[in-house]
């Protein structure tokens, strides 16, 4: 039976590091989460997941079935290292191959949404050519995703090219494809000079999930909840009033903390209290 509750998930990098997904999903369940978002970042270790064997993929599926904790989304940040906008043809080809493998992986294990990093390039200088190549790369990527019935969703970034929902909507209109949508990060959105509530309202109808974290201007990671600039309650209220009923994902990087689970519990309670005030979830 489908739950009527708003799904609340936790980012893989918030939990203890390791490759045993059964342990990770059991812990997430113990901590009260509905799902875990997988990370495929630019490290060789996490990139190697895209080359998992059939048995390794089945082990993940079996862990999901056994625990009842889903893995419905993937944060694909590997394109920092292999950007779709790269002027180096070999690097760009690697970026497209990573996209192909990620879409195939998602199709195999039941991941519905791949969150994309909105960088034309990250470690190089951007220009009109890198942006053109990025657009063309997205077009190729969405064609692959369409055939696999996997949604690609653009994150709102810590980078000027994609630092607002309005900018991401421009790409959605350009691609004009139901398999390309938006996955805003209310922390990143709030760290720039955006009218955050108007931006959230503008994205309704295209938002498939929401990242939840705190930020400060120029500081996009590891800001403790409540110490940054994000008006969480208003963001949750705006999304609820606009009709958004999809998942929220607490994004943290506590996997190397002395006690990751304790850090996650503290963040979970803080976020759920703000969601309850906004009427997004029932008060504890």
UniProtKB/Swiss-Prot annotation:
Function: Catalyzes the isomerization of L-xylulose-5-phosphate to L-ribulose-5-phosphate. Is involved in the anaerobic L-ascorbate utilization.
Pathway where this protein functions: Cofactor degradation; L-ascorbate degradation; D-xylulose 5-phosphate from L-ascorbate: step 3/4
SUPFAM superfamilies, per database record: Xylose isomerase-like
EC number: 5.1.3.22
Domain of life: Bacteria
Claim: Transmembrane helix is one of the keywords in the record: no
Protein name: L-ribulose-5-phosphate 3-epimerase UlaE
A Pfam family it matches: AP_endonuc_2
PANTHER family named among the record's database cross-references: ISOMERASE, L-RIBULOSE-5-PHOSPHATE 3-EPIMERASE ULAE
Organism per entry: Shigella sonnei (strain Ss046)
């Amino acid at each position: 039976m489908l739950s009527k509750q708003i799904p609340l998930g936790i980012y893989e990098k918030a939990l203890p590091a390791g490759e045993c997904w059964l342990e990770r999903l059991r812990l997430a369940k113990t901590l009260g989460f509905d799902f875990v978002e997988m990370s495929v970042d630019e490290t060789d270790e996490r990139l190697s997941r895209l080359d998992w064997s059939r048995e390794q993929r089945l082990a993940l599926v079996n862990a999901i079935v056994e625990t009842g904790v889903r893995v419905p989304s993937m944060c694909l940040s590997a394109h920092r290292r292999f950007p779709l906008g790269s002027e180096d043809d070999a690097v760009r080809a690697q970026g497209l191959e990573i996209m192909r493998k990620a879409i195939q992986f998602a199709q195999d294990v039941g991941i519905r949404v791949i969150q994309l990093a909105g960088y034309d390039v990250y470690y190089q200088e951007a220009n009109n050519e890198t942006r053109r190549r990025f657009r063309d790369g997205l077009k190729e990527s969405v064609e692959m995703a369409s055939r696999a019935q996997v949604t690609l969703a653009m994150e709102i970034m810590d980078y000027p090219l994609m630092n607002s929902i309005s900018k991401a909507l421009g790409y959605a209109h350009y691609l004009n494809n139901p398999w390309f949508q938006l996955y805003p990060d209310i922390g990143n959105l709030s760290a720039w000079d955006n009218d955050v509530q108007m931006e959230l309202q503008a994205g309704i109808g295209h938002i498939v999930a929401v990242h939840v974290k705190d930020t400060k201007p120029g500081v996009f990671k590891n800001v403790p909840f409540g110490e940054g600039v994000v008006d969480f309650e208003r963001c949750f209220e705006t999304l609820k009033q606009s009709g958004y009923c999809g998942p929220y994902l607490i994004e943290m990087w506590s996997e190397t903390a002395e006690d990751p689970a304790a850090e996650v519990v503290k963040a979970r309670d803080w976020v759920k209290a703000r969601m309850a005030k906004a009427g997004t979830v029932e008060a504890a």
